[in-house]
Amino acid sequence: MDALEDYVWPRATSELILLPVTGLECVGDRLLAGEGPDVLVYSLDFGGHLRMIKRVQNLLGHYLIHGFRIRPEPNGDLDLEAMVAVFGSKGLRVVKISWGQGHFRELWRSGLWNMSDWIWDARWLEGNIALALGHNSVVLYDPVVGCILQEVPCTDRCTLSSACLIGDAWKELTIVAGAVSNQLLVWYPATALADNKPVAPDRRISGHVGIIFSMSYLESKGLLATASEDRSVRIWKVGDLRVPGGRVQNIGHCFGHSARVWQVKLLENYLISAGEDCVCLVWSHEGEILQAFRGHQGRGIRAIAAHERQAWVITGGDDSGIRLWHLVGRGYRGLGVSALCFKSRSRPGTLKAVTLAGSWRLLAVTDTGALYLYDVEVKRWEQLLEDKHFQSYCLLEAAPGPEGFGLCAMANGEGRVKVVPINTPTAAVDRTLFPGKVHSLSWALRGYEELLLLASGPGGVVACLEISAAPSGKAIFVKERCRYLLPPSKQRWHTCSAFLPPGDFLVCSDRRGSVLLFPSRPGLLKDPGVGGKAGAGAGAPGVGSGSSGGGNAFTGLGPVSTLPSLHGKQGVTSVTCHGGYVYTTGRDGAYYQLFVRDSQLQPVLRQKSCRGMNWLAGLRIVPDGSMVILGFHANEFVVWNPRSHEKLHIVNCGGGHRSWAFSDTEAAMAFAYLKDGDVMLYRALGGCTRPHVILREGLHGREITCVKRVGTITLGPEYGVPSFMQPDDLEPGSEGPDLTDIVITCSEDTTVCVLALPTTTGSAHALTAVCNHISSVRAVAVWGIGTPGGPQDPQPGLSAHVVSAGGRAEMHCFSIMVTPDPSTPSRLACHVMHLSSHRLDEYWDRQHNRHRMVKVDPETRYMSLAVCELDQPSLGPLVAAACSDGAVRLFLLQDSGRILQLLAETFHHKRCVLKVHSFTHEVPNQRRRLLLCSAATDGSLAFWDLTTMLDHDSTVLEPPVDPGLPYRLGTPSLTLQAHSCGINSLHTLPTREGHHLVASGSEDGSLHVFVLAVEMLELEEAVGEAGLVPQLRVLEEYSVPCAHAAHVTGLKILSPSIMVSASIDQRLTFWRLGHGEPTFMNSTVFHVPDVADMDCWPVSPEFGHRCALGGQGLEVYNWYD
């Protein structure tokens, strides 16, 4: 070990920050964004690309940027150079920047000036800067000399929550101060008789019943807008505020936000507001809501900016995302809801069903059996036909495809189906399929080659009709191809269907929530044992018995694969096939991604919709390749984009318990429904897309609770595709720019996110997000890291198994596979497959003797996870979980994670367990020992010998038929009182001497480091290696009582000589080990508040180490040894 004086201290530098965006400002065709102390510069020039051109790091030191103020130029030209004042918290810095010819350059930078109070606003005054400070005072500052020229307080020295400075010279400077008394104080600093002489307020404006967070003044119209804690925006007619004694009139009291309003901005024709509800509203000056922009996640939108010449609104949120929206007139506007005025004396009867044949033709049927057509362009109703057989009960469905292929189908309660060509209704064809009621109709289209109509009758029989047209197009042919038989259920009919490319199978769904796979024609079933025929006469055309009395009276083709009750008893609402996957939606609020392998349906991933939208009605793939979800949120029809988390369209229709139809093309989107005896139609140009730009994707809407690095992918320079490489196998000559780290983060927002972190670009790419959890996700563990093709076939990419756990005692296991994809910005794509899940309350409900037991607390949370890989790979790993109910639980993962079973537990700690950590003890010529360490809120550590526990009862590893109660872990091998309060961080590292270095960090800011020896003792009654029992003993023990000023939430032993710790005090500290008590080496201030977890890993000898810190944001550091 080198001497202390010869050691080079690590120098940690920040390379990536993902924090809430707190400041935005448009400067010409550029956008300045403040993220922590960093400034992001985006190019908004339509002649080029919307992209980030520069990140200026650490511009404001350790302060958060809250605003930018641009010095006005005499010629008004800001396209080449700009002088910018950047302020936030108590810091101010002035920079002169140039971005001519697309190149960003910093020409001059002033020093960082620290004010004595919080800066609420800044304004340029003839080369100087006026600052509005937190206790109602104004400072005139000289940015060249760096000194205060004048400071004037107000007589009301109250705390401010916002302020606005108005005027271009000191003599006319006006401040509108938002006091904590919910009043606006208007006063004039230049009226002070002497320096530091207080000035009395000229006017007091009252009206809000909450703190005023933001205000904006429009000089051209004499309007002032304020945003408040009371969830309202007020518009005041104030005239010219630079003139004392003016009259103030409240001309608008705008309610539209469901939470506190953070920001407001007045434009010439609009008022923009944004708040805690993550909604940006566009108002008229009369207080009418014109547009609503939704897409950010989490706790709100923190910054807004506007580009009036381009009619843009830019928003920055707590989720670190930046989005650009088009104002009215620039985007695709919804044409609103219009009544089609069906009621007329010439159209008797009551409307029963409605459907859309494309986006401009609408069909409706009445209880008299009349079928009507409405042309949106002509705006006229036309009766196509009338059939008395379709009175009272009638189903109506239009064929899919461009403008409905000109076909629709009707069905009645007597088993009759009518196929109607819309252009020539006299050529309609009738077929009687069943002796009873037709329960449902659906179309299945395979390109332009094949069109099928499926009709469900009594007894679960589904008739499959093949529809074709004559060469003249004036006649159609309807031929029954075969019949299918659904599995028994209470409501035995299908709900939707779709062809599975290339067309050999049909994917159907039924009312009980099952997804079924049928052959598209009977001849495809070569093996009668697969799927098979249910009873005699299967596939025979004509009328079947179809009685619900059952038996085997009627037969049909059975499904070759079934996923029973996938969406629950509410049923499946849509089936869509795209990109080799099957997507299903249901009324359980979830949509599934399925995969067909060897004629069997396999679930891949279950995703939840937006909060509150439990009735999913459909799924569409838009031209850019992304998907949108259709559904009902209470009484509203919603088109939701899961990628951007945005509600693209909202129609107040009254709910889904009515006849409705949806159609979309690239040109337009239409939604029709019945309400109050009339047909209502909503149309929007541009289909299901919204012309907005995501300048930067958001990460998480709430705090990050865990960060876990999975592996490193090397981007091959000659091929431009990634290849998997373990960090320890990197060649000494490999360069950092080729490396991309794959990191998993989990959050309080119930999502698990997979990120790609390149080593050079200073950016993060969100590859995918998993939304299976119903509560917060607090811990993630990774195992089985490798390549997609396995060791024998090393394909480019990375694969791993992931276990996530959190609130409501819920645990999920899924696999990820990261593969090359040149079409994405990161050149990577991530495929996720959900494998298994487990919840403690569901486990207890399955017990036969549950009436004798106290049910597990449903509020139990998993605080930490650790993977313990056994010597027998066929058995899978163990997952240890630290639980808030005082238990340490062991779960067994089998069948590559598809079986997740509770194996054993212990309540040794008798209080909340915060951390678990597993490690192995390996000695030559001896068996590998598996050890587990747990830490609780009382500061105690417990060590468990898992190998001995499993040896004494080998049947534990065999999944029993009836698992009953879990096994007990017994007593720990060693207990240790390391701290006086809770332990939030824990890590171990083996030493060269065969011992283990153990370090822990506590809530009191202390560190505890000790050397643990594992000695093998042989039992007298045992023979062989099974009789070896380890004895754990502490050799050396050291403590650092005041290592940090707050909770130590991250700790990593990098080597036997160096350790790094992170704390809520926002310090990343390096410690020297190996010379007795740990000694301080170096410390770096990071910018993530309330850091909850940290992970460190070596990248390459040239690039050194990387460290990811997660809390209310994400920050990545790197350093060289």
UniProtKB/Swiss-Prot annotation:
GO terms for biological process: wobble position ribose methylation. It holds the Pfam family WD40. The keyword Translocase does not apply. Keywords: Acetylation, Cell cycle, Cytoplasm, Repeat, tRNA processing, WD repeat. Its main location: cytoplasm. InterPro entries: Quinoprotein_ADH-like_sf, tRNA_Anticodon_Mtase-Reg, WD40/YVTN_repeat-like_dom_sf, WD40_repeat_dom_sf, WD40_rpt. SMART domains: WD40. Interacts with FTSJ1; the interaction is direct, and required for 2'-O-methylation of position 34 in substrate tRNAs. Interacts with IRS4. Interacts with STK11/LKB1. Together with methyltransferase FTSJ1, methylates the 2'-O-ribose of nucleotides at position 34 of the tRNA anticodon loop of substrate tRNAs. Required for the correct positioning of the substrate tRNA for methylation. Required to suppress amino acid starvation-induced autophagy. Enhances the STK11/LKB1-induced cell growth suppression activity. Belongs to the WD repeat WDR6 family. This is tRNA (34-2'-O)-methyltransferase regulator WDR6.
